[in-house]
A protein has these predicted regions:
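Membrane-embedded hairpin module used as a gating/binding unit in multi-pass transport
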Residues: 176-250
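Interfacial loop-to-helix junctions that mark the boundaries of transmembrane helices
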Residues: 15-20, 73-86, 167-172, 226-228, ...
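Interfacial helix-loop-helix linkers and transmembrane-helix boundary segments
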Residues: 38-47, 66, 79-80, 100-115, ...
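Conserved small/polar residues in nucleotide/adenosyl-binding loops
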Residues: 268-269
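N-terminal alpha-helical transmembrane segments of multi-pass membrane transport
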Residues: 1-72
Length: 269
């Protein structure tokens, strides 16, 4: 066996031989996202891990994401992805978000709850557009619609339940949309408001007592879970994190949820 035949065999077994245009397209998308994360600093904590994970997952013959194999033999990225597919990481992220959230302004001014209704507009627009294409089932359209709410963990959770085959693209689309909000939001704000309106200083809200802040997460979970049981996993973890924060007796758990746990989950999702 001469040198050239050995070289030919080596190349035939290398990733170059298995490289397709689809891999190249995904490489290009991942490089664009990396550029946006590093150069433009659009939500780098979200975009950079997503972009590089996308790059690694599309390396041909690398064995990092073999969906055909059993989960413990399917590559390190597939094993990490099981945490996303099982909704473990989205729920843990919600716990971290809850630990970082102060619901005091909402308790003091419940009318501000209506501001959250704006997210429903984006959800219905995305759902309608997906349904209009005729390419997706109603469940898949609903999962795609959640992207319009700009909420990555919720989009992943809903996709796991309604469109398991679309979890990966929906997750990437949702987090990319979240990362682009700093670019999308300013021109819309300037279009819909005047300069004088943007200079309005909000009045100081009433002081919210500790009892109210402790009772709030318990009441919300009880009421919403009885009204709509399917929201219990996400909402329960969100309010558990908030209870860590507001109880005043679990400082270490609150700090861990806000920092270490949140960062670990961001790495894996």
């Amino acid at each position: 066996m001469n040198f050239f035949s050995i070289l030919g065999e080596l190349l035939a077994q290398s990733g170059f031989a298995a490289l397709t245009w689809r891999n190249c397209v995904m490489f290009l998308i991942s490089f664009i996202l990396l550029y946006m994360a590093i150069k433009k600093q659009y939500e780098p904590l979200l975009l950079l891990p997503i972009a590089f994970g996308m790059f690694l997952a599309n390396l041909p013959l690398a064995g990092l994401m073999n969906e055909a194999d059993h989960w413990y033999q399917s590559g390190v990225l597939r094993i990490m992805y099981m945490g996303v597919k099982s909704s473990l990481f989205p729920c843990l992220i919600f716990m971290a978000v809850g630990a970082m959230t102060d619901f005091g302004p909402l308790i003091a001014n419940p009318v501000s709850l209506l501001l959250g209704a704006a997210a429903q507009f984006g959800i219905y627009v995305a759902f309608t557009l997906a349904n209009a294409t005729g390419l997706f089932t109603p469940g898949e359209c609903a999962a795609i619609g959640i992207i319009g709410g700009a909420d990555g963990p919720t989009a992943i959770y809903i996709a796991n339940n309604l469109a398991p085959d679309l979890v990966a693209p929906i997750a990437v689309a949702a987090y990319s949309y979240m990362a682009l909000i700093p670019l999308i939001q300013p021109p819309i704000m300037k279009l819909l408001t005047t300069k004088k309106e943007r200079q309005i200083v909000m009045k100081q809200l009433r002081k919210v007592s500790k009892v109210e802040k402790v009772v709030f997460p318990v009441f919300v979970v009880l009421f919403c879970s009885l009204l709509l049981p399917s929201v219990a996993p996400l909402l329960g973890m969100l309010m558990l994190g908030n209870l860590f924060r507001e109880s005043g007796v679990t400082g270490r758990l609150s700090d861990t949820a806000q920092n270490a746990l949140c960062n670990i989950c961001l790495l894996y999702t």
